[in-house]
């Protein structure tokens, strides 16, 4: 018997026992209600490749060259990646779609490397304004200089942007707003860039609200003058953990393809197949899903505000334009007591301590996953009621079951129909 980190012995690491623990946790997860805005639940259809042999395989022959099958196994299904990319292009109204990134951060690295030379300046959004925490440090590691922009309630200060651009050394404006109930006006940003520094590229990291863009609820950055946009595919878009980048510019696409050769080896074939199936499955439902997601977010925000929670945002405009709802809480102890009661009752929430315009520990909630599973107005009202209850006491043992009983049809293929029609 050996003793490892944390005092664990080899007896504690029996693989069968560990698998049982995973299975038990997975069963609980299947019934839980997840209100974390940076997560979503992949559909049964899209999840199939993740349990297939393709999870073990490389796939490099993106052009389908019959003389380039150095790694075998993908010949018969290579077209699925192409079909999925085409569906994504249609949803984004984009000429080009790059599905090589393996995550949102991978997409960020690829974009920065492709669209800015070493030593140049890249402008991003300050974390205190909702920007991604890692962007400035990542830029430094890649040999770029970082400049930060303020963004208040979704509004970028145009005079500040013009001032940052004026020296002429900015290669890329990388709009990385992740914490947002309002989305910046990309058209106005593009206009400033084209006037002050026409050679500067504009990229929108839409990781959090990608599904709302693809569903037509929020403005398409390409239509607003951005050179490219993209991000992760597992937040408001119900896909696997992957990344995607869209552009209409041939030179941008070529730069991305050139950079990916060095920065992305395996693009994780099973996950790419899963992304393709997710895109093909939701393409015709994406508009309805995006609208329902925002409707549910606004309904949740309003119900919580009516119950006395301090909800961030303007009640006159529905508190949020995205899937996110922010709620201020009364100190760390109260925040974790609420989160623990909810988790024990099967409702998962996201605590944050660095949200723009808010102090202390607070809730960052998302309507995206429960909407994908079929939550409608009544279910959302009862979810809000569960949060109200959890401020004072534990939830009842059937609370989640009863809320799920209010769900309508999900935005994905019925699993039983899938088994019959696919012969599974």
From Swiss-Prot:
- List each coiled-coil range: none
Q: What is its EC number?
A: 2.2.1.-
Modified-residue entries (N6-(pyridoxal phosphate)lysine), positions = 235
- Provide the alphabetized UniProt keywords: Antibiotic biosynthesis, Pyridoxal phosphate, Transferase
Tell me where on the tree of life, at the top rank, the source sits.
Answer: Bacteria
Pathway, per UniProt? Antibiotic biosynthesis
Q: Does the keyword Iron apply?
A: no
> GO annotations under biological process?
antibiotic biosynthetic process; glycine biosynthetic process from serine; tetrahydrofolate metabolic process
Q: Pfam families per the record?
A: SHMT (PF00464)
Look up keyword Transport and say if it applies: no
GO MF annotation terms: glycine hydroxymethyltransferase activity; pyridoxal phosphate binding
Q: Which Gene3D superfamilies match?
A: Aspartate Aminotransferase, domain 1 (3.90.1150.10), Type I PLP-dependent aspartate aminotransferase-like (Major domain) (3.40.640.10)
Cofactor(s) it depends on: pyridoxal 5'-phosphate
Q: Indicate the family of this protein.
A: Belongs to the SHMT family.
Q: What does this protein do?
A: Catalyzes the condensation of L-threonine and uridine-5'-aldehyde to form 5'-C-glycyluridine (GlyU). Forms (5'S,6'S)-GlyU. Has no activity with alternative amino acids, such as glycine or serine.
Designated name of the protein: L-threonine:uridine-5'-aldehyde transaldolase
Task: Name the encoding gene, please.
Answer: lipK
């Amino acid at each position: 018997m050996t003793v490892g980190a944390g005092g664990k012995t080899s007896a504690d690491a029996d693989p069968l026992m560990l698998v049982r623990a995973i299975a038990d946790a997975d069963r609980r997860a299947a019934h839980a209600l997840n209100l974390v805005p940076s997560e979503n639940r992949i559909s049964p259809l899209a999840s199939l490749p993740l349990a297939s042999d393709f999870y073990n395989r490389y796939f490099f022959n993106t052009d389908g060259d019959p003389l380039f099958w150095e790694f075998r196994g993908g010949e018969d299904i290579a077209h699925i990646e192409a079909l999925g990319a085409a569906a994504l292009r249609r949803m984004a109204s984009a000429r080009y779609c790059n599905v090589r990134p393996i995550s949102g951060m991978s997409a960020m690295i690829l974009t920065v490397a492709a669209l800015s030379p070493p030593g140049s300046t890249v402008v991003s959004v300050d974390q205190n304004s909702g920007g991604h925490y890692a962007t400035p440090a990542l830029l430094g590691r890649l040999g770029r200089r970082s400049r930060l922009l303020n963004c208040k309630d979704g509004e970028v200060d145009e005079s500040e942007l013009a001032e940052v651009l004026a020296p002429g050394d900015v290669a890329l404006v990388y709009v990385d707003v992740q914490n947002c109930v309002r989305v910046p006006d990309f058209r106005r940003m593009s206009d400033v860039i084209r006037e002050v520094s026409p050679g500067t590229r504009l990229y929108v990291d839409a990781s959090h609200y990608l599904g709302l863009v693809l569903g037509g609820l929020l403005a398409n950055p390409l239509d607003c003058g951005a050179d490219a946009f993209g991000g992760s595919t597992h937040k408001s878009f119900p896909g696997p953990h992957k990344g995607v980048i869209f552009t209409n510019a041939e030179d941008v696409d070529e730069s991305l393809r050139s950079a990916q050769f060095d920065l992305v080896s395996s693009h994780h074939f099973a996950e790419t197949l899963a992304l393709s199936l997710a895109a093909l499955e939701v393409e015709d439902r994406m508009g309805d899903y995006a609208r329902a997601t925002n409707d549910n977010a606004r309904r949740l925000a309003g119900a919580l505000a009516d119950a006395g929670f301090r909800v961030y945002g303007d009640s006159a405009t529905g508190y949020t334009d995205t899937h996110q709802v922010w709620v201020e809480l009364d100190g760390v102890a109260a925040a974790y007591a609420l989160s623990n009661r909810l988790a024990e009752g099967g409702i998962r929430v996201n605590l944050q301590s660095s949200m723009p315009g808010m102090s202390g520990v607070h809730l960052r909630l998302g309507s995206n996953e429960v909407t994908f599973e079929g939550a409608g107005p009544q279910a959302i009202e009862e979810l809000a009621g569960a949060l109200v209850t959890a401020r004072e006491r534990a939830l009842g043992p059937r609370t989640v079951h009863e809320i799920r009983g209010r769900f309508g049809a999900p935005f994905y293929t019925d699993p039983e129909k899938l088994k019959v029609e696919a012969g599974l």
